Design a protein with these regions (language model features):
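Hydrophobic helical membrane-anchoring modules
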Residues: 9, 212-213, 218-243
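Conserved acidic residues
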Residues: 15-16, 56, 77, 112, ...
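Conserved core of the sugar-phosphate nucleotidyltransferase
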Residues: 93-95, 113, 122-208, 213
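N-terminal glycine-rich phosphate-binding loop and ensuing alpha1 helix
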Residues: 13-61
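Catalytic metal- and UDP-sugar-binding loop of GT-A-like glycosyltransferases, i.e.
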Residues: 117
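Short phosphate-binding loop-to-helix
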Residues: 59, 66-114, 124-134
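Short active-site oxyanion
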Residues: 54-59, 142, 217-218
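N-terminal amphipathic/basic-hydrophobic helices that include classical n-h-c signal peptides
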Residues: 1-11
């Protein structure tokens, strides 16, 4: 792993935030710009990235003119649209990020640090983004990502086969839940990278990951209407809690 770093300081350069917002959502139409507690959901991450004050560029990667206009209205840059290759249902996030980095390179701009932010992550805050960058610099990590603990121990999980349940790992049957190792999953919010290590990995997961542990009340995957409503409930709850 390359461990050369520049001092972050108050005016760290060569840092880009890339918000990935494709227009073709099928399960929740126009998901990335749908109203969420009073404004388009993508607005939350744009505002958080700008407020963090650590990015030279906050941009949105999209194939949608509507998403582009709304994103610009909240302060993000949209200097180009996605290619056909990165606009389909099978495009990998890593390919989108590579495309953005290469496009900026062709415009004479290269970045040392990058944060990929998902547009439907309203729990992302400026403080979390700064925390990630500080961890990236301090620990000389290749990547920093938010994670949250599984609410129920996966090692006590079951699989269904031929209409019957079987424990996936029966060796843990007699173990108390509190005695099992805590396992975590991706919070699905953002990834911060040291760009040379991102290129080296060739995918969104690199070696040398430093975690930021998030409370489960600040994490919600949004794939359907039930998820959306749950996210709004959590968001309102967290807002009330901060008052």
């Amino acid at each position: 792993m390359i461990n050369i770093r520049v001092d972050m300081g108050d005016n760290m350069k060569n840092n880009i935030a890339i918000i990935t917002a494709r227009g073709g959502s099928k399960r929740i139409p126009k998901k990335n710009i749908r109203d969420f507690c009073g404004k388009p959901i993508i607005a939350y991450v744009i505002e958080a990235a700008i407020k963090a004050g650590i990015y030279d560029t906050v941009m949105v990667s999209t194939d949608s003119k509507e998403i582009a206009e709304i994103s610009k209205g909240y302060g993000a840059e949209v200097p180009f649209f996605r290619s056909e290759k990165t606009s389909n249902d099978y495009a990998a996030t890593a390919d989108v990020l590579m495309e953005v980095l290469e496009a900026y390179k062709q415009m004479g701009e290269e970045y040392t640090y990058m944060t990929c932010i998902y547009p439907t992550a309203p729990f992302v805050t400026a403080e979390k983004l700064k925390q990630a960058m500080e961890a990236l610099m301090k620990d000389k990590a290749s990547m920093v990502m938010p994670v949250t603990a599984f609410s129920y121990p996966p090692l006590r999980g079951y699989i269904m086969k031929d209409g019957h349940l079987n424990m996936k790992w029966p060796e843990y049957y007699k173990c108390r839940s509190q005695d099992l190792e805590t396992l975590y999953h991706d919070a699905g919010q953002f990834y911060s990278y040291y760009v040379p290590d991102f290129y080296k990995a060739g995918g969104i997961i690199t070696e040398g990951i430093v975690p930021i542990v998030a409370d489960e009340m600040e994490v919600q995957d949004i794939d359907n209407e039930t998820d959306w409503r749950m996210a709004e409930l959590k968001y309102r709850f967290m807002c009330e809690k901060k008052r």
